[in-house]
């Protein structure tokens, strides 16, 4: 039964999604015309406005002490330098859609003037006045719209010919790796940083270093020396470094060793290991003692039929060999096993030798050295090989990560039927040489070890390599932080980088204000044939049974440090609507301080292009589904509508783990791993990076993971539910409800019942209270409903590519047909459709009364009046009903707005008064103080719109009065 559910949840959607969008309709939140988010703007805080954002106790605060959360987007390259008109439109759009943070990346190119702060020329000694004018204006507009700006200080820069950096022409792309190792490179780059941060923005009147608008900086972007070492990219040839820069790193390594040891003799002594114990650690390895066999045989009778016995026929050594005959198997290697007890010592090098043959060629065999006691981990050897019909000797070396007196050597034999014969099995500890011939500190000839060279480097030699690279990276981050703080006086948030490939990366960043985790789901894969073709997997992250890639952000959480997450998904994935919901929901639950969609745009042209440009898989600026969901996801995250995890699960790391990165397992880099799903049930963070003992299988502290129900991965607040079997995720809080994923049939999400009426598969619905009341009692609420989004005329190849039929404008959404119902005591319920500017555009649509006090609304995006993802739900109570009156502490429900503003030849006034039944008047007051009535009626809670008369240029005032309400609003009429 479970298998069929998994198949229906993963395989079937892929088949269905091969079809074009069903009943698509054009929609995109306006690009250039200012949005008018009057319905939800009162729920947006003022992060980034009026003062520095302050890290305190691992949380972000405004200057008045108010906690802040940032919902941001990353902008790249020329998108960081819009023209003046576009800058205003971009800032306004971001604010209207709920964003209150922006990261600007790729502003430091050396060879692309349109995407650089630097003056064109042969050196990097001056800023470009034209480019800085663009950047200054853009930052001022972002600040004006309460959007915090983060700058990547190094992302693309490499030295120019006149910068005085040796061998600049052989520096890797974007200066990666060399940023940490080349002092001349670092010195020149600091001069650029000084130029930038001492530059005075004429529109704010402040230098960047003292401008709270520049809320934070990244020291580097998508860069990590440790990551390059892990991937064996720091040698020449074969890596990213030239011969010069590889030798430069060799020199630094030799200097590190000289400081630590002083001489070759001391180095040799430190890197040496004791003489090996030469015994065979496999008792009765030749099967000669038939009365004390030592070997244990096991066959799972439910899926296999097999026997083990000694044989005297065609043996390799002595009288006997061990024979396993398998008559039946399901193909699982572990269905038939043969093992022997042994022991291993931590960090020692071993060689396993054995002879084997099989009854048929190409016979698979798996072997492992495994701990027979808790925590039952692999002990350095886990290998698949193939046997032939003739005797063959196998030699396998491994290094033991731990001491294990109850280890086991296991042969896994269940892959195939037939016979397997083993003989002369030996396990020996090996001697090791600390230095290779000719290696010496004096001649700078001590080779740096490859990350994967566990067998060729003694343990202490490898640890010194680890310490060297970690120290280099940490030293760069901390010296740059001191430069920013002490030399430049910068007061904003300082972040190191975005790559966390090892625990060592995290360690190197511990002096920063916060840690950043960057990850994503799915990616573009290029194909060799046909030329230029590509595909994506197009699978839902919600179908992943281990929390997808969200643990890649969760591991960036450290006690008393800010936690920041970046996430990306590729267009045209059908599942991109999962991204804003999952990121904001688990970000709030885990207590992350900022989340960024990565990325919004990477060129100026993107801002005015009403579709996703060809091959721009990660640009979100014109993605209808993601951008339509942004307001509700952002407000829920920023305003704490989703509760912080009730219980925490602090993780412990150790310095010993730091020095053994090859044994850092899983997302949280623990030696014995961790179930990634711990973050779905508890708030997870590193409590200490230098604990006396590392956390061991922390999932044992989560009872729900002892026998996990994959359809009910429920947070301890009971607000977030990840159903991996049905690829469904729900958020259930008093003021915010959301469901995304496999939207089929009937679903109950808190008070909201969602029934899918069409034959579609993917869908997302969010329902957000626009006042302080729970959703069933909310006077106004925002309903957002989206499915797949794609360019017009896109042609799918199966379900994974549109490389030949990318499509063009306009961006379209797949229509949803839903029946929504909830319990309500309101006397009148009206639903309005909002247009791409956020204005009332259609409706009101009535709802049906159901038995038991429930109401029902049919949402049909195939019908023209409902060609929108945004719906405003208005619930009214009779004037005598006290529930319609603003309660103590609740903000007034009355509001007034003029659009457009400044007004031109025409304009209109939109306003609402709470249903008090009091007389109401709207007056226009001209520059001479004369009044003109525009409307008279009663405050009945209705949304109203009144046209402005033709007015001469000047400053006017509107006055809306009703009972104790009085709203005055300026009206500027432009020529």
Segments (PLM) and residue ranges:
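Active-site mouth of glycoside hydrolases
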Residues: 32, 47-279, 368, 374-375, ...
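C-terminal beta-strand-rich structural cap/linker in extracellular carbohydrate-active enzymes
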Residues: 853-881
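Long, low-hydrophobicity ectodomains and other hydrophilic envelope-associated domains
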Residues: 634-833
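C-terminal outer-membrane/trafficking sorting elements
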Residues: 888-899, 903-975
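Substrate-binding cleft of secreted/luminal carbohydrate-active enzymes
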Residues: 577-610
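A glycine-anchored, Pro-Gly-centered beta-turn/N-cap motif
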Residues: 318, 347-348, 390, 827, ...
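Extracellular and organelle-lumenal recognition/adhesion modules and their flexible linkers in secreted
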Residues: 274-444
């Amino acid at each position: 039964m479970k298998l069929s559910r998994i198949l229906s949840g993963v395989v079937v959607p892929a088949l269905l999604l091969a079809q074009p969008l069903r009943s698509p309709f054009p929609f995109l939140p306006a690009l250039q015309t200012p949005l008018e988010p009057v319905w939800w703007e009162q729920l947006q805080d003022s992060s980034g406005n009026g003062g520095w954002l302050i890290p305190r106790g691992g949380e972000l605060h405004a200057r008045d002490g108010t906690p802040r959360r940032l919902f941001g987007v990353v902008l790249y390259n020329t998108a960081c330098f819009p023209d003046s008109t576009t800058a205003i439109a971009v800032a306004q759009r971001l604010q209207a859609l709920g964003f209150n943070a922006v990261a600007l990346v790729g502003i430091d190119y050396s060879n692309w003037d349109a995407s650089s702060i630097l003056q064109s020329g042969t050196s990097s000694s001056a800023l470009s006045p034209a480019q800085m004018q663009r950047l200054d204006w853009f930052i001022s507009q972002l600040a004006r719209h309460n959007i915090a700006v983060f700058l990547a200080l190094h992302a693309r820069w490499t030295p120019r010919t006149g910068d005085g950096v040796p061998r600049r022409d052989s520096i890797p792309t974007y200066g990666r790796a060399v940023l940490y190792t080349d002092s001349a490179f670092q010195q020149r780059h600091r001069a650029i940083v000084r130029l930038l941060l001492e530059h005075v923005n004429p529109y704010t009147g402040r230098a960047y270093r003292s401008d709270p608008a520049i809320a934070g900086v990244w020291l580097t972007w998508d860069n990590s020396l440790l990551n390059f070492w892990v991937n064996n990219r720091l040698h020449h040839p074969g890596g990213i470094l030239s011969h010069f820069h590889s030798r430069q790193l060799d020199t630094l390594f030799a200097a590190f060793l000289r400081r630590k040891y002083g001489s070759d003799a001391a180095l040799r002594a430190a890197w040496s290991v004791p003489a090996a114990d030469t015994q065979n650690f496999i008792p009765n390895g030749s099967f000669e003692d038939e009365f004390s066999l030592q070997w244990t045989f096991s066959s799972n009778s439910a899926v296999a039929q097999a026997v083990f016995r000694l044989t005297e026929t065609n043996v390799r050594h002595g009288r006997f060999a061990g024979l396993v005959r398998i008559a039946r198997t399901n193909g699982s290697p572990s269905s038939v096993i043969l093992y022997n007890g042994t022991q291993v010592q931590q960090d020692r090098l071993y060689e396993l030798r054995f002879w084997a043959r099989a009854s048929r060629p190409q016979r698979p065999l798996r072997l492992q050295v495994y701990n027979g006691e808790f925590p039952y981990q692999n002990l350095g050897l886990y290998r698949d090989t193939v046997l032939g019909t003739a005797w063959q000797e196998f030699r396998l070396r491994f290094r033991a990560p731990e001491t294990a007196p109850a280890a086991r050597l296991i042969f896994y034999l269940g892959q195939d039927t037939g016979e397997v014969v083993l003989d002369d099995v030996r396990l020996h500890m090996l001697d090791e040489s600390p230095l290779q011939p000719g290696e010496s500190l004096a001649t700078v000839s001590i080779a740096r070890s490859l990350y994967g060279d566990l067998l060729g480097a003694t343990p202490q030699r490898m640890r010194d390599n680890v310490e060297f690279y970690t120290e280099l990276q940490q030293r760069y981050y901390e010296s740059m932080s001191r430069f920013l703080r002490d030399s430049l006086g910068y007061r904003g948030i300082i972040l190191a980088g975005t790559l966390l490939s090892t625990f060592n990366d995290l360690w190197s960043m511990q002096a920063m204000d916060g840690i950043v985790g960057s990850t994503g789901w799915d990616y573009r894969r290029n194909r060799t044939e046909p030329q230029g073709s590509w595909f994506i997997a197009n699978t839902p992250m919600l179908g992943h049974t281990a929390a997808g890639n969200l643990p890649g952000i969760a591991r960036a959480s450290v006690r008393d440090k800010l936690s920041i997450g970046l996430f990306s998904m590729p267009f045209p994935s059908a599942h991109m609507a999962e991204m804003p919901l999952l990121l904001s929901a688990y970000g709030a639950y885990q207590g992350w301080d900022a989340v960024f969609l990565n990325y919004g745009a990477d060129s100026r042209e993107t801002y005015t292009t009403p579709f996703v440009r060809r091959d721009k898989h990660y640009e979100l600026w014109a993605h209808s589904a993601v951008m339509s969901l942004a307001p509700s996801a952002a407000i829920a995250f920023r305003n704490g509508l989703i509760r912080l995890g009730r219980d925490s699960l602090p993780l412990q790391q150790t310095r010993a783990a730091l020095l053994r990165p090859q044994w850092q397992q899983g997302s949280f880099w623990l030696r014995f791993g961790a179930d990634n799903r711990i973050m779905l049930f508890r708030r997870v963070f590193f409590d200490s990076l230098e604990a006396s003992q590392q956390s061991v299988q922390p999932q044992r502290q989560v009872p729900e993971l002892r026998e996990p129900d994959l359809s009910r991965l429920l947070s301890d607040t009971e607000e977030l539910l990840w159903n991996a079997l049905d690829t469904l995720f729900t958020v259930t809080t008093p003021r915010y409800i959301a469901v995304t994923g496999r939207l089929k049939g009937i679903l109950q999400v808190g008070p909201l019942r969602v029934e899918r009426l069409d034959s579609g598969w993917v869908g997302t619905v969010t329902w957000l209270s626009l006042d302080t009341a729970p959703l069933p009692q909310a006077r106004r609420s925002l309903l957002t409903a989206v499915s797949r989004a794609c360019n017009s005329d896109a042609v799918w190849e199966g379900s994974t590519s549109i490389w030949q039929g990318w499509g063009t404008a306009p961006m379209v959404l797949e229509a949803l047909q839903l029946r929504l119902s909830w319990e309500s005591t309101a006397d009148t319920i009206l639903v309005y459709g909002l247009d791409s500017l956020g204005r009332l555009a259609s409706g009101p649509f009535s709802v049906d009364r159901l038995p038991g006090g429930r109401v029902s609304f049919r949402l049909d995006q195939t019908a023209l009046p409902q060609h929108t993802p945004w719906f405003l739900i208005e619930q009214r109570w009779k004037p005598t009903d006290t529930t319609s009156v603003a309660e103590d502490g609740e903000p007034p429900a009355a509001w007034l707005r003029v659009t457009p503003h400044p007004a031109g030849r025409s304009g209109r006034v939109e306003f609402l008064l709470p249903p008090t039944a009091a007389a109401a008047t709207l007056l226009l007051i001209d520059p001479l103080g004369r009044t003109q009535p525009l409307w008279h009626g009663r405050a009945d809670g209705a949304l109203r719109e009144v046209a402005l008369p033709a007015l001469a240029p000047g400053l006017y005032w509107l006055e809306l009065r009703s009972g104790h309400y009085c709203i005055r609003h300026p009206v500027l009429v432009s020529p």
